[in-house]
Amino acid sequence: MPLIYVDTLEDPRLDAFARLTEAQLRSKLEPERALFIAESQKVIERAFEGGMEPISLLMEEKWLPSMAPLIERMEERAGMRPGGEGLPVFMAPHDELERLTGFELTRGALGAFRRPALPTVADVLHEARLVAVLEDITNHTNVGAIFRSAAALGVDAVLVSPACYDPLYRRAVRVSMGTVFQVPWTRIGDENVPNRSGCGTWSNEGIAELHEHGFTCAAMALSDDSMTPDELSALLAARETASG
């Protein structure tokens, strides 16, 4: 693996970690160049095990021994030969990494990964029995927490509405502890249709699509007449300020 030592985050090779905004990382106009950032060794490992393609790593040197086996696996899967070009691994001072992340980076490293193309709804629902649908969740921390809960509860897949915040946003990935790479997910509904009154909503076609796949749609609420999701079920979680 090539080790690249940098003294400052101003190095242009670290743009993906230090300067690109989330919108720039997503690169909608050039999706083949889109990236996302994973923080901590555990999340990086889960991203890799979830089939994500690593582009480069950034860490403090003391974490290299614990990361080395994972880096070796990354290079092996990419067909990189030992002693060859390898996966770029940037080494930065502790203070610079703390300044970048905004907190004490006690769990190792950051990884830049290629953002994958989203699967179709049909692909995600294949063999799924319990699905969570996130409608317009507009808080990245909540998105990550819901994915973590979904993984713990055995949810088979997650569908997110067009206006729901991005599950691959850096904070969402971190809060999810990498479960966004373990639970299959995709977008449902037409992203080009504004999700506001009078302009149509994702549910016009999205709910029908779920019904076509045999799912019963149920809102998540405390109620005496609540159902038990014994059959194919899609649990709908609305945005934080929704009522009714």
Which role fits each region the language model picked out?
Residues 1-68, 72, 164-165:
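Boundary-proximal intrinsically disordered activation/regulatory segments immediately upstream
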Residues 4, 42, 49, 81-86, ...:
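RNA substrate-binding interface of SAM-dependent RNA methyltransferases
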Residues 13-17, 44, 97, 106, ...:
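A general structural signal for well-ordered alpha-helical segments in protein cores
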Residues 32-35, 53-56, 86-88, 157-158, ...:
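Short active-site oxyanion
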Residues 72-79, 87-106:
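Glycine/small-residue-rich loop that forms an oxyanion/phosphate-binding "nest" at active or ligand-binding sites
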Residues 108-112, 174, 240-244:
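Short basic, glycine-rich beta-strand/loop surfaces that mediate nucleic-acid
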Residues 229-244:
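A contiguous loop/helix-start segment that scaffolds small-molecule binding in enzyme catalytic cores
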